[in-house]
Amino acid sequence: MVQRGYMQYLYEADGRKYLDTVNNVAHVGHEHPRIVRAGQDQMAVLNTNTRYLHKNIVAFAEKLLATLPGPLSVAYVVNSGSEANELALRMAKAYTRQKDMVVVEVGYHGNTNACVDISSYKFDRKGGTGAPGHVHVVPIPDTYRGIYREKEESGKRYAFHVKEAIEKVRSQGKGVAAFICESILSCGGQIVLPEGYLKEAYQHIRNAGGVCIADEVQTGCGRAGDYFWAFESQGVVPDI
């Protein structure tokens, strides 16, 4: 039985140590001293939430926004990735006054009802009931096991399916609210998107009046090597 964790390790009660390779999207390990200290310091001053204005909320938002391209200039502090994606969906629907979503096969965006509805990783697996009527799934842009495996032009070819999904929505007399995609497909197999995929997909969505959402829950905040945000590797700027 695991008793505690420290940095990249887990420890049993008898002191046996394990390298933790299964803890999902841990960023800086367990009980990182700087994180523990920052949490202790804040708890000793104010247990903050969004109902109260506190200088540290503003300072955090400013530091976060400094890592993003200029057009992305507003930050909301929420409790989880699921809540962040729920908020993104609400904003996209409010802005476009549409409901239909274009999503990627085997994508995962959270465990709330609305997030499961747009997560092929959930609704197409055991216990799932398939995509809801307002959700349109495009093929996973995987150049290793996917339908297009050549390096050149595969990004455009996969993105063309986004255009096809838009045309399907329009044929039903509706419009598209948004396209949501993990900047690196995480639960789908840690798949790096082919070059040009997001640029082409985003253009199709914007031409249709929709909003482009980059899900960076598992890939953002410095996890993508030279890029602080994984969408930067595709040379794009999302709307949300």
Region annotations inferred by a language model:
Residues 1-240:
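Conserved N-terminal phosphate-binding loop of PLP-dependent enzymes in the Aspartate aminotransferase
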